[in-house]
Amino acid sequence: MLHNPTGKERLALAFLLGMLAILGPLNIDMYLPSFPEIAKDLSASASLVQLSLTACLVGLTIGQLIVGPVSDAQGRRKPLLICIFLFALSSLFCALSPNITTLVAARFLQGFTASAGLVLSRAIVRDVFTGRELSKFFSLLMVITAVAPMVAPMTGGAILLLPFATWHTIFHVLMIIGFLLVLLIALRLKETLPLEKRIPSSIGTSVKTMGSLLKDRSFMGYALTVGFIHGGSFAYVSGTPFVYQDIYGVSPQVFSILFGINGLAIISGSFIIGRFGGIIHEKSLLRIAVITAMIATAVLLTMTMIHGPLATLVISIFIYMITIGMVLTSTFTLAMEKQGHRAGSASALLGMLPLLLGSIVSPLVGINETTAVPMGAIMFVTAVIGSLAFFGLTKERVGQNS
């Protein structure tokens, strides 16, 4: 069993867990540049294409709720191997989809199986690290994970430039990544949850564990904070392919760059937490992040209402994504530090809420395909609600932590 690894072993674990964690972002972001092509090829509306993203998010949500508790009972390694293998197969099903209905169904399966990478990478970190090392490794994992939203759409756009490539090719690439990850897990990942720390598996036990988490006021405060603020970012994920390309007229490759630079924003936000977390309490940094998120999205909404220059949208979203990096890193650290044996279930709930909200808001962005206002409005409202959750449900700890 691993415990607080150092040196090369630590770096190897960071790489492996980072690869698992980015499976979700790759699954979400890599095919975004092909949205207009998918709509044309499958004779589908923008909202129907966005529904394929919603299906993926629903799959990620439900999958985490199942995989998390199962891993608390069965260990991390076996469920991970099974799910990632099935992810590779479901990616092939996506590539072979002849119509939008089949693609939506295949995307649900793809999201469901990819959920293991998200939830179990975090649970493994909690198994292996404690205290300040837990916070530092979460920050490192977030930096690795943040590269995916930057690289994924660029990779997707680059793939579409190949003379033989279509949107199907992107899913073939995801299939190959899945099979490579299966080999990596089988060869390099040790079990991190010892038998004596496992929770007996049953529906009743899973419900009881989730119930205890839902009653934990502080935990739910952090969960709802990341749920709404990060969940609202999926309005940007599903909206910008059409806003940037159809409303502002940029090419798929330029869109990929504009979308991808926000990975740098997430990295910057995560770096701020990792760099200053030992000097300023993470809750104080989180407070700054949620306030900044409200301000940035208020500016974004204003710019969409007056049809401001593209640069104003890009800058507002970049600042907003810095706060996403801060919120993701700090909320997971603050929420997970006391979860111990129920880390898998806690990780599942933390990962589920943003995806659940994202699955709701994604198709709403396409209600009016001629304006970016729905995207801006959704991002602003979710930032406000997330901030209210933070200030309302975690305030009992402000005195002792700040």
From Swiss-Prot:
One of its GO terms (molecular function) is transmembrane transporter activity. GO terms for cellular component: plasma membrane. The keyword Transmembrane applies. It is found in: Cell membrane. It is a multi-pass membrane protein. The keyword rRNA-binding does not apply. Keywords: Cell membrane, Membrane, Transmembrane, Transmembrane helix, Transport. PROSITE patterns: MFS (PS50850). Belongs to the major facilitator superfamily. Bcr/CmlA family. This is Uncharacterized MFS-type transporter YdgK.
